From Swiss-Prot:
BP term (GO), one: translation
GO cellular component: cytoplasm; small ribosomal subunit
Keywords: Ribonucleoprotein, Ribosomal protein, RNA-binding, rRNA-binding
Native species: Aquifex pyrophilus
Family membership noted in the UniProt record: Belongs to the universal ribosomal protein uS19 family.
Protein name: Small ribosomal subunit protein uS19
Annotated segments matching region Unknown: 1-128
Lineage, uppermost ranks: Bacteria, Pseudomonadati, Aquificota, Aquificia, Aquificales
Length: 219
């Protein structure tokens, strides 16, 4: 089972692993902020299932327009009315409540839209850095790199089956998750260029049934 030449086909590594790792962490933080904003401010009635930047921007503009119209109505309703009369007007009170509600929606949408925009900007940088490159899990890469510098050889666990094995991994034992448990995989030179998941099968072959097994005859 020889893998000679496999690495030549995939020899497109990211030039700066440290910058890649920093950008990866930044992307994770931005994603977390988006999720928090949607959970805190984004009710289903408000977002209407829209989470893409373009949809959110359109929704924000729409709500801003509604707010402007309501404010205009409020100004018209206040015209020529004494303060005491205005305070007792139930229709006016309802209009004020509606203005406050839409104003809160606009603020919430602005927060969500700004965070989604920031996330998409970071994701664009991340995509540009990783496009047409061999995928290596950034956390695993940095951990192996630190172990190489310290001369350590501990077993490292990972869920990243899609990670491409790179020369820095040679000599390490990486426990790869197969969906049920971690399978220890000792990395050799021949494995370079392949995926970690190739060496931690998700299914095991238990053999064919014995020839002596009962065969049900067709009637």
């Amino acid at each position: 089972m020889g893998f000679k030449g496999a690495w030549n086909k995939r020899n497109r590594l990211i030039e700066n692993p440290e910058e890649y790792y920093r950008l990866y962490k930044k992307l994770q933080r931005a994603y977390k902020l988006v999720r928090e904003a949607i959970k805190r401010y984004g009710s289903f009635e408000l977002l209407k299932g829209k989470t893409s930047l373009r949809d959110l921007e359109e929704l924000l503009e729409e709500r801003k327009q509604v707010l402007e119209n309501l404010k205009k109505q409020l100004r018209e309703a206040h015209k020529g009315k004494p303060k005491i009369e205005a305070e007792g007007d139930e229709q006016l009170k309802e209009l004020i409540r509606e203005v406050n509600r839409v104003q809160s929606e606009v603020r919430a949408l602005e927060i969500i839209t700004n965070r989604v925009r920031k996330y998409e900007e970071i994701y664009a940088q991340y995509k540009q850095m990783t496009e047409k490159k061999a995928y290596v899990d950034p956390k695993l890469w940095m951990r192996i790199r630190k172990m190489n510098e310290a001369g350590e050889r501990k077993v490292v666990r990972t869920y990243s089956r899609a990670t491409t094995i790179i020369p820095e991994f040679v000599g390490h034992t990486i426990a790869v998750h197969n969906g049920k448990t971690f399978i220890p995989v000792y990395i050799t030179q021949d494995m370079v260029g392949h995926k970690l998941g190739e060496f931690a099968p998700t299914r095991t072959f238990k053999g064919h049934p014995d020839k002596t097994a009962k065969v049900v005859k067709k009637k």
